[in-house]
Amino acid sequence: MKVVEVKHPLVKHKIGLMREGDISTKRFRELAKEVGSLLTYEATSDFETEKVTIDGWNGPVEVDQIKGKKVTVVPILRAGLGMMDGVLEHMPSARVSVVGIYRDEETLQPVPYFEKIVSNIEERLALVIDPMLATGGSMIATIDLLKKKGCQSIKVLVLVAAPEGIKALEAAHPDVELFCASIDQGLNEKGYIVPGLGDAGDKIFGTK
């Protein structure tokens, strides 16, 4: 499995800011969007382009355009919504699919509760977004679902990943690509990433 830890200074700086213990909901939300945007830039760097002639201000001009790439952005509810606007800034015409999965706090197992997948998913690249890749359970369940629907091309964008989650994802889906802002130390006894960001969903939505 291709794993890319984006080491751009802006990404590292913003993830560092997100680790502040008393960060406000507004600030955390802004940074989640910004880092999501920067990860999208990296994840789409292999898109092919083609030459197209358009009418410029001074007559015809040849420009580069992305070559027929159909994309669906797949936020995992609820925390994935915090990254969605940052991704869509670069691809405002992308379709959005939604998958609802929560992690049982006692068993740490993923529990699906909602899905709405775009049509022609088999023709699209899916960019699955979720702030945290901890145990990997929710991400694996989401990719299982997408593949059952016919999706053949999947990239995963997360803010912070634990080695345990990366290992589990690679074992289940070695054909996907993972882009993250930080690979952290690991999981604590409750299944949270350390040092991590805390509960990203609560911080994005202002709930506890």
Swiss-Prot record:
Gene Ontology molecular function: any one: GTP binding
Domain of life of the organism encoding this protein: Bacteria
Pathway(s) served: Pyrimidine metabolism; UMP biosynthesis via salvage pathway; UMP from uracil: step 1/1
Enzymatic reactions: UMP + diphosphate = 5-phospho-alpha-D-ribose 1-diphosphate + uracil
Residues the record lists as binding 5-phospho-alpha-D-ribose 1-diphosphate: R78, R103, D130, P131, M132, L133, A134, T135, G136, G137, S138, D199
InterPro entries: PRibTrfase_dom, PRTase-like, Upp_B, UPRTase/APRTase, Ura_phspho_trans
Gene3D superfamilies: 3.40.50.2020
Cofactors required: Mg(2+)
Keywords annotated in UniProt: Allosteric enzyme, Glycosyltransferase, GTP-binding, Magnesium, Nucleotide-binding, Transferase
Protein's UniProt keywords contain rRNA-binding: no
Known EC number: 2.4.2.9
Activity regulation info: Allosterically activated by GTP.
Keyword Transferase assigned: yes
UniProt-listed GO biological process terms: UMP salvage; uracil salvage
Residues noted as binding uracil in the record, renumbered to the chain: I193, G198, D199, A200
Free-text cofactor note: Binds 1 Mg(2+) ion per subunit. The magnesium is bound as Mg-PRPP.
Protein task: Catalyzes the conversion of uracil and 5-phospho-alpha-D-ribose 1-diphosphate (PRPP) to UMP and diphosphate.
Family statement drawn from the similarity comment of this UniProt entry: Belongs to the UPRTase family.
Annotated protein name in UniProt: Uracil phosphoribosyltransferase
